[in-house]
Design a protein with these regions (language model features):
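Short acidic (Asp/Glu) patches
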Residues: 33, 61-76, 85-107
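Extreme N-terminus nucleophile/cap motif
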Residues: 1-64, 181-189, 220-226
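Conserved beta strand-loop-helix elements of the APE1-like EEP
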Residues: 15, 82-85, 174-176, 211
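A structured binding-face within diverse protein domains that lines the active/interaction site
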Residues: 64, 81-92, 106-109, 119-146, ...
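Conserved catalytic micro-motifs used in adenylation/nucleotidyl-transfer and phosphoryl/amide-
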Residues: 7, 48, 100-117, 161-225
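Short Pro/Gly-enriched beta-strand edge/turn motifs at strand-loop
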Residues: 28-33, 91, 153-155
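Short histidine
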Residues: 118-175, 179
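Domain-scale activation on soluble regions of proteins
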Residues: 37-45, 50-64, 68, 78, ...
Length: 227
């Protein structure tokens, strides 16, 4: 069995509250240009979460391509923490399902994923209809007992044990204090490598570079924690 989610995502931590409109336009342009290794577009919906002043995650999701909904970008609120995701569905039956669009969130955490896992086999059922939901279930279990950094490393070990091959595994996480990323791949590094931008006031984890920002690669096999 394969767990596949060929997607693009960004996670933002800002020193001050910012409006997401400008960065969403850049993200939408990047997602529109991007192609997965098998040629798919990230056109099967998108979502955005932002942390409100009362420390609760707000969310907007759509089954339309993100670049077709630029007229909505001005409607979202300012925030210091923003998470966005543009999706390429695994199968035709998986398209047009709003609940399958990320980000996923629970409690303090917002989560995004992209990657391809081959030969996935666990001894017990895992909650979730699709691969990204199941990975989120596994990560939540770890987050209930360990720090975000340790949870991401433990999740990687768990997937290594229960997958024949991990072609790509990219996870982004935000807890309303810091942002985190884990990145690994066995092929197609130009697609799977995450990027990181850091300035004195803004930090961005992104699937690909955004126009107007300087990025460096995220180290493979390590957790990036941006305080």
């Amino acid at each position: 069995m394969r767990r596949r989610d060929m997607c693009r995502f960004i996670i933002i931590k800002s020193q001050n509250e910012i409006h997401p409109e400008d960065i969403l336009h850049r993200f939408a342009a990047m997602a529109r240009r991007s192609r997965s290794p098998d040629g798919d577009r990230q056109s099967d919906g998108w979502g955005i979460s932002w942390l409100s002043n009362d420390m609760k995650w707000q969310v907007h999701k759509s089954i339309n391509p993100i670049w077709d909904e630029s007229h909505t970008f001005s409607s979202f609120s300012k925030s210091r923490f923003i998470v966005a995701h543009a999706r390429s569905a695994f199968s035709k039956n998986d398209k047009k399902v709003l609940a399958h669009n990320q980000p996923f969130y629970r409690g303090a955490y917002a989560f995004v994923f992209n990657g391809l896992l081959r030969g996935v086999s666990f001894s017990s059922p895992i909650a979730g209809d699709i691969g990204s939901q199941k990975i989120w279930t596994l990560l939540q279990d770890q987050l209930g007992r360990f720090s975000p950094n340790d949870s991401l490393l433990r999740l990687n070990k768990m997937l290594e044990k229960n997958c024949r091959e991990i072609e790509g595994l990219n996870i982004g996480l935000c807890d309303g204090i810091n942002i985190y990323a884990y990145c690994r791949n066995s092929m197609h590094p130009e697609y799977y490598n995450l990027r990181f931008h850091e300035s004195s006031t803004l930090k961005i984890i992104s699937s690909e570079a955004l126009d107007g920002y300087d990025f460096v690669p995220v180290e493979i096999g390590q957790v990036l924690t941006s305080y």
